[in-house]
Regions:
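Residues in well-ordered alpha-helical elements
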Residues: 1-2, 98, 129-132
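Conserved SAM/AdoMet-binding glycine-rich loop
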Residues: 3-124
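Flexible glycine/acidic-rich beta-alpha junction loops that bind and position SAM and/or redox cofactors
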Residues: 30-31, 86-91, 124-129, 142-189, ...
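Short, hinge-like loop/turn segments at secondary-structure boundaries
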Residues: 37-38, 134, 163-167
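Catalytic cores of alpha/beta
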Residues: 61-66, 124-142
Length: 200
């Protein structure tokens, strides 16, 4: 922990504008995450720190700590992916959207942390109707930003091994992005991509 704090202090001393933590579930270790957040909250700096978190597992003690964070000191990226609980279970994410939403709303009420909520198009079992509902569910929360990604079937991943089962067609070139599935067509994915690019 001392070594980590020395590293963070280096960024602070150099007046780095943004530091991104690449751990996709930064707060899965309560003791570790609260120690880091406490240190960064108390630091004298304008550096912003970006974390990818699992909002549904935020504890009351963490929320209370985060209330003390200077405005814009932290930004959180929350991987919603879909609000369809059946699809979440299919991709081995055993969490309900209602639990994510509850904590995201609590963070929004604090008004000092910018939140990015991520959606993924092309998930197995999610058709265009389900995706639209996912988007509307997330939009209704009014986060600062919604980010849309398209499913990537990386080599060695369990989802790639199940590609045939769900009729998932994907590019043969890295990063192996989804082209179509049994549930969502190529044209529908292309429309989503164009709408996202030109509608931003």
């Amino acid at each position: 922990m001392k070594e980590l704090k020395r590293n963070y202090s280096f960024f602070i001393d150099k007046k780095v504008k943004l530091v991104k933590f690449v751990d996709r579930t930064f707060n899965c270790n309560f003791k570790f995450s609260t120690a880091i957040w406490e240190f960064l909250i108390n630091a004298e700096t304008n550096t912003q720190f970006h974390f990818e978190i699992s909002a549904d597992i935020l504890k009351p003690q963490e929320l209370e700590l985060l209330r003390r964070a200077p405005k814009d000191r932290f930004q959180f990226e929350v991987g919603v992916q879909t609000t369809n609980d059946e699809v979440l279970n299919r991709i081995n994410r055993f969490v309900n959207f209602s639990d994510i939403k509850e904590k995201v709303v609590e963070l929004l009420e604090i008004k000092n942390i910018k939140q990015h909520l991520d959606l993924i198009a092309g998930l197995p079992g999610e058709d265009i109707v389900s995706f639209k509902k996912s988007f509307n569910d997330v939009y209704s929360i009014e986060p600062e930003e919604i980010q849309l990604g398209f499913l990537k079937l990386l080599r060695g991943s369990s989802m790639r091994e199940e590609a045939e089962e769900y009729g998932m067609r994907y590019s043969p070139y890295p990063p192996y992005e989804i082209i179509a599935t049994n549930d969502i067509s190529y044209d529908e994915l292309l429309t989503l991509k164009k709408s996202w690019i030109y509608g931003r």
